Regions:
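Ligand-binding clefts/hinges and TM-proximal coupling segments of bilobed small-molecule sensing domains
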Residues: 44-45, 176-189, 195-201, 284-306
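A bilobed periplasmic-binding-protein/Venus flytrap-type ligand-binding module shared by bacterial periplasmic
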Residues: 149-160, 261-276
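Short, polar/charged alpha-helical segment
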Residues: 60, 66-95
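Immediate post-signal peptide segment of exported/extracytoplasmic ligand-binding proteins
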Residues: 24, 49-68, 89-90, 160-166
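Terminal targeting segments of Actinobacterial cell-envelope proteins
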Residues: 1-28, 54, 59-63
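A conserved helix-loop-strand patch within extracytoplasmic ligand-binding domains
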Residues: 142-191, 290
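Ligand-binding "clamshell"
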Residues: 129-142, 157, 230, 235, ...
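Short helices/loops that flank or line small-molecule/ion binding pockets
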Residues: 82-83, 87, 105-119, 183-184, ...
Length: 306
């Protein structure tokens, strides 16, 4: 170029790159990597969900501590588990410890997934409700352990026959314990159920005769104990009434509960054939457990021997 030539202006790039060199976009590569990571994680989660983990639970590990759960604050069931842990489990070659958990669903999920070895929280019909509501849970009742104290409570009367016409009576609001309450009232001679009805699935609609025209109110465990002063009677678990400060003298009828309502040692199905779980079941079947239930004041009137 000569000194007299006028420089030809350089045309700006079509897209202003502010002086930086424009390179090919990396966005497709980044998206591809993200998709790959998501697929790998999803596959791993699915593999774990179908039992693909190499990690062993305490249920299948020799010498591990086997946790037996019930609800936090349940002193009677805790006392039973701690008795088994101290006095019975060593005879069966295992180590057992108590674990308190928040509620039924949390307990049963922990059993199903092997976070705890077992629970003594429930009877078979309650377990059936849980499994119906949570079809992914894999649990089963391994052996009956005790019967819960269960009775007819009243602030106003001392015998079921004293209940007046149109008496207000409460049953529990969950299906299994509603059925247990109706069985109980039939035993007391206050109602009869329709012929052929499955008594363990009965509801108030299955009542055939009700001579006193009892008026039923369905309440949950805590609400029922609070409502007792406003009721003529209520059918419920002794432990809830004692915990609420209601005297055992208010329990006016208390026959032994049927086998269907025995408290069960519930285990995770996946581990039922492991040595640890077999030994745990044997520990809860040990005769010393029934002797404890007969004699220990911490479980009196609450957990009854079979």
């Amino acid at each position: 170029m000569s000194d007299t030539e006028t420089p030809t202006p350089t045309a700006p790039p079509a897209d202003d790159d502010h002086g930086f060199t424009t390179r090919g976009s990396r966005r497709p590569l980044i998206i591809g990597v993200v998709v790959l990571v998501v697929l790998v994680v999803a596959g791993f989660v699915g593999w774990r969900a179908f039992g693909g983990s190499d990690a062993k639970t305490a249920n299948e590990t020799a010498g591990a501590t086997l946790l037996v759960a019930t609800t936090e604050g349940n002193a009677a069931e805790q006392a039973l588990i701690e008795f088994v842990a101290k006095e019975v489990a060593p005879k069966h070659g295992i180590t057992v410890a108590f674990k308190g958990l928040a509620d039924s669903t949390t307990i049963n999920r922990a059993v199903s997934e092997g976070e705890v070895a077992a629970t003594v929280y429930q009877h078979k019909l309650w377990l059936g409700q849980v499994l119906q509501a949570n079809p992914d849970f894999r649990e089963e009742a391994a052996t009956p352990v005790f019967r819960w104290g269960f009775g007819l409570f009243s602030d106003k009367y001392t015998d079921p026959r004293q209940l007046p016409q149109n008496a207000k009576v409460s049953l529990y609001s969950d299906p299994a314990n509603e059925a247990q309450g109706l069985w109980f009232l039939e035993r007391a001679g206050l109602i009869t159920l329709k012929p052929g009805v499955n008594k363990w699935q009965a509801t108030v609609k299955d009542i055939a005769t009700n001579p006193k025209n009892l008026q039923f109110t369905l309440l949950d465990f805590a609400a029922q104990t609070r409502a007792l002063p406003d009721l003529d009677a209520a059918v419920g678990y002794t432990e809830y009434y004692l915990a609420a400060g209601v005297s055992i003298e208010k329990e006016i009828f208390a026959p032994p509960a049927p086998d269907e309502f025995a408290g069960q040692l519930t285990i995770g199905t996946r581990w039922k054939d492991t040595e640890n779980i077999k030994n745990l079941v044997a520990a809860f079947q040990d005769p010393a457990v029934q002797e404890f239930l007969r004699t220990d004041p911490r479980v009196k009137d609450i957990l009854l021997p079979l």
